[in-house]
Swiss-Prot record:
GO molecular function: S-adenosylmethionine:tRNA ribosyltransferase-isomerase activity
HAMAP family reported in the protein's UniProt record: QueA
Annotated protein name in UniProt: S-adenosylmethionine:tRNA ribosyltransferase-isomerase
Homology family: Belongs to the QueA family.
GO cellular component term of the entry, any: cytoplasm
Annotated localization: Cytoplasm
InterPro entries in alphabetical order: QueA, QueA_dom1, QueA_dom2, QueA_sf
Enzyme Commission number, as recorded: 2.4.99.17
UniProt keyword annotations, A-Z: Cytoplasm, Queuosine biosynthesis, S-adenosyl-L-methionine, Transferase
Gene this chain is encoded by: queA
Complex and partners: Monomer.
Functional pathway: tRNA modification; tRNA-queuosine biosynthesis
PANTHER family: S-ADENOSYLMETHIONINE:TRNA RIBOSYLTRANSFERASE-ISOMERASE
Length: 359
């Protein structure tokens, strides 16, 4: 929605200084009491709270939400052959019980070795065999023994929430790192813009004629990866599994036809919908998406965005810059820092509505 300038291609242009105490280490309670920085078109920023959202939207708007659910993907076990402690992060399942994983210490886990999980290594609750290395990620392919139902049951007992590396506390309530509408198990990180919704807020929005429609994009480890090429146009985006239901496509088409706005809740919802429309026509179905959105991108569907504050030099900052412009985004971030907003996964949010009017 904004024309790029040559400086928009430079990685350093997406850097900013964030005081460490602005990184939220826990979530606000209640969920919808997070602060909300509202970014209208060519007007002063507004400071609100997330519970003000119904007054900032209008009947006929459609919110696209990502209904992925975070798996307790971090496991601790022992190498059966030596007793060496092992940490495993489940990344993505490729068939029942067959997982791409990241492991520590990786060098000691060669194909043919096995890992036991559970309080008693002599009688483990789960056992995984190392079948292969993965050159692309440096990870390992693990096959868990036993039936799929038993695996998921034990994972719920043994697994821990894989909080981002900048959060140094543990999740006292694992559900706080899930959205209230999460349904489809498969993510290793939460779609954090959705963490601010409560059931009551969703009901209020629906009563006002502001609908929601789900997509599923299973957030992968690539979401924490920084861009590492100076010319961002050379960046290779990670791919993630996504699904756009036919009913969601129909809702989007009806909203557009009636003059309503399609507002994505989070960058993952953006990538799912815009990825499904990459051919020029929005199509339902399941696929993998590796769409990299940066300044100069021609938007197909999305009119507005709810998003948290993102890490410097990240692809997520570039996506938001494609919507409102890099200079304006950095100016908004500077305001947010000065006004003591909380940043990153458990932090506050932004509402970007190019045609918003002060309620």
């Amino acid at each position: 929605m904004n024309e790029p300038s040559p400086s928009d291609w430079h990685l350093d242009a997406y850097d900013y200084e964030l005081p460490p105490d602005r990184i939220a280490q826990s979530a606000v309670e209640p969920r919808d009491h997070a602060r909300l920085l509202v970014f209208p078109d060519r007007e002063q920023l507004w400071h609100r709270h997330f519970y003000d959202l119904p007054q900032l939207l209008r009947p006929g708007d459609l919110l696209i939400v990502n209904d992925t659910r975070v798996i307790p993907a971090r496991l601790y076990g022992q190498k059966i052959e030596t007793g060496v402690p092992v940490e495993v992060l489940l990344v993505e399942e490729h068939g029942p019980g067959y997982w791409l994983t990241l492991v520590k210490p990786g060098k000691r886990l060669k194909p043919g070795s096995a890992i036991a999980f559970g309080p008693n290594p002599e009688d483990p609750l789960l056992v995984a065999d190392v079948e292969a290395s993965d050159p692309a990620t440096g990870g390992r392919w693990l096959r868990f023994r036993g039936e799929a139902e038993a695996f998921w049951s034990q994972l719920a007992t043994l697994g821990e929430m894989p909080l981002p590396p900048y959060i140094h506390t543990t999740a006292s309530d694992p559900e706080r790192y899930q959205t209230v509408y999460s349904r489809e198990l498969g993510a290793v990180a939460a779609p954090t813009a959705g963490l601010h919704f409560t059931p009551e807020l969703l009901t209020t929005l629906a009563d006002m004629g502001i609908a929601t429609a789900p997509v599923t994009l299973h957030v992968g480890i690539g979401t924490f990866r920084s861009v590492d090429v100076e010319d961002i146009r050379q960046h290779e985006m990670h791919s993630e599994r996504m699904m756009v239901p036919a009913a969601t496509v129909e809702k989007i088409q009806a909203t557009k036809a009636a003059g309503g706005r399609v507002i994505a809740v989070g960058t993952t919802s953006v990538r799912a919908i815009e990825g499904a429309a990459a051919s020029g026509e929005l199509k339902p179905g399941s696929d993998r998406v590796n769409l990299f959105i940066y300044p100069g991108y021609r938007w197909q569907i999305i009119d507005g965005l709810i998003t948290n504050f993102h890490l410097p030099r990240s692809s997520l900052m570039m996506l938001v810059s494609a919507l409102i412009g890099r200079d304006r985004l950095l100016s908004a971030y500077a305001t947010a820092i000065a006004e003591q907003y909380r940043f990153y996964s458990f932090g506050d949010a932004m509402l970007i509505l190019p045609d918003a009017k002060l309620p």
